[in-house]
């Protein structure tokens, strides 16, 4: 086999379809987020505003987080020195897991090197722990959930997105005695819509199923202490396993699950993705713990309120211009263009001509024909920056003769 030719064909296919991913080299400046500097391909530098980051609340720059990380770094050094089982468990990891468990009202938590690995490792391990487990998965679940569900082959049922009637139809058709788990998300990141948590929990109770919720795009962002949509809606006690991230609203790095002590102990003991991975650096654990603790407070609520206000303002301004946005009331602002080449072109022009950095979102992240720009306004974006973004979008939409009819929600 000509391996180089095969690689060339694979990469060329992405170019031909307009979905080859280009990394934008940026340098964030401490204390200045969302401002950054773009290292242009021609060697020049350009000041930009980041509009597509997952540091939703700017906590990656917060003095409380940085102070905790500096203190830990000076106290114990850089790496953890091992897996959790072999010299890699520290007081920082223990405190972080206790903070997470308290956040979700659970007995225990387990920290992974990413939320992707937490999903993959946990869902695949549940098949080992519960032989014959049937997993019911929302059709728009994240890739990490899909991979975990596919691993350790077992029965799975895919229900139409947020369609609880279809879920009930599928679960009612299966063996009542079989172990069951419903896996879904609280906020779906590409459309910004919410999962029907209460209705899914009702079905789980009726059929004796476990509930597994991915709150990656919700933790830190919703609820009086930032525990997510389940907390906001008073439903945390009805969820068996929470998955979350430390790398989005909390602004640091890593992922986790929170559940009963018995469930966490079993996953800890059986999940290869946990057992054979080096643990988080102590400074990372310290920063994440400080971020979670801060966002539980009234000061954290002020950040959430400011973020929601900026998201509403941006949506209102874009709607007034007839932009094809999808608005489900979340913090995510998708603007649908519907063509990968056009989406990339608009993204490139926003960056080079206006200093607005928003990454194009193409297939397979979203279905073909729904390619989009996905804006994530934060509390540290100001109204002047929103004005600049809206002005740039208006000019480019006219220049490129793009559709101004509102997208279907």
From Swiss-Prot:
The keyword Lipid metabolism does not apply. InterPro entries: 4pyrrol_synth_NH2levulA_synth, Aminotrans_II_pyridoxalP_BS, Aminotransferase_I/II_large, AON_synthase_class-II, PyrdxlP-dep_Trfase, PyrdxlP-dep_Trfase_major, PyrdxlP-dep_Trfase_small. Pyridoxal 5'-phosphate binds at residues 189, 217, 245, 277-278. The active site is at residue 248. Pathway: Porphyrin-containing compound metabolism; protoporphyrin-IX biosynthesis; 5-aminolevulinate from glycine: step 1/1. Keywords: Acyltransferase, Heme biosynthesis, Pyridoxal phosphate, Transferase. It catalyses: succinyl-CoA + glycine + H(+) = 5-aminolevulinate + CO2 + CoA. GO terms for molecular function: 5-aminolevulinate synthase activity; pyridoxal phosphate binding. This is 5-aminolevulinate synthase.
């Amino acid at each position: 086999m000509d391996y180089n030719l095969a690689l060339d064909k694979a990469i060329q296919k992405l170019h031909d379809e307009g979905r080859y991913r280009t990394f934008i080299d940026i340098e964030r400046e401490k204390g200045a987020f969302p401002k950054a500097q773009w290292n242009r391909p021609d060697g020049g530098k350009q000041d930009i505003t980041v509009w597509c980051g997952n540091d939703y609340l700017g906590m990656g720059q917060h003095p409380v987080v940085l102070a905790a990380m500096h203190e830990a770094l000076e106290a114990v050094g850089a790496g953890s020195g091992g897996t959790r089982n072999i010299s890699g468990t520290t007081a920082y990891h223990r405190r972080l897991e206790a903070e997470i468990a308290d956040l979700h009202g659970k007995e225990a938590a387990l920290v992974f090197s990413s939320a992707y690995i937490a999903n993959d490792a946990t869902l695949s391990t549940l098949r080992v722990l519960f032989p014959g487990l049937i997993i019911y998965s929302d059709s728009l679940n994240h890739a990490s959930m899909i991979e975990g569900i596919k691993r350790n082959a077992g029965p799975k049922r895919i229900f139409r997105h947020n369609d609880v009637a279809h879920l009930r139809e599928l679960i009612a058709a299966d063996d009542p005695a079989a172990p069951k788990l419903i896996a879904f998300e609280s906020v779906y990141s590409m459309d910004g819509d919410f999962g029907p948590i209460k209705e899914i929990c009702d079905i789980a109770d009726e059929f004796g199923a476990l509930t597994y919720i991915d709150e990656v795009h919700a933790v830190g962002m919703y609820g009086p202490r930032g525990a997510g949509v389940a907390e906001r809606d008073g439903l945390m006690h009805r969820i068996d396993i929470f998955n979350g991230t430390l790398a989005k609203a909390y602004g640091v790095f890593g992922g986790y699950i929170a559940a009963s002590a018995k469930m966490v102990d079993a996953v800890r003991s059986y999940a290869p993705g946990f057992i054979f991975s080096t643990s988080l650096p102590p400074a990372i654990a310290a920063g994440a713990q400080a971020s979670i603790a801060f966002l539980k407070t009234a000061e954290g609520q002020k950040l959430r309120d400011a973020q929601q206000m900026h998201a509403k303002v941006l949506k209102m301004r874009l709607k007034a211009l007839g932009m094809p946005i999808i608005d489900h009331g979340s913090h995510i602002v998708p603007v649908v263009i519907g063509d990968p080449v056009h989406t990339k072109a608009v993204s490139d022009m926003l960056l080079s001509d206006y200093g607005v950095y928003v990454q194009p979102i193409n297939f397979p992240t979203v279905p073909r024909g729904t390619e989009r720009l996905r804006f994530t306004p934060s509390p540290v974006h100001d109204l002047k920056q929103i004005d600049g973004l809206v002005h740039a979008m208006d000019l480019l939409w006219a220049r490129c003769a793009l559709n101004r009819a509102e997208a279907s929600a």
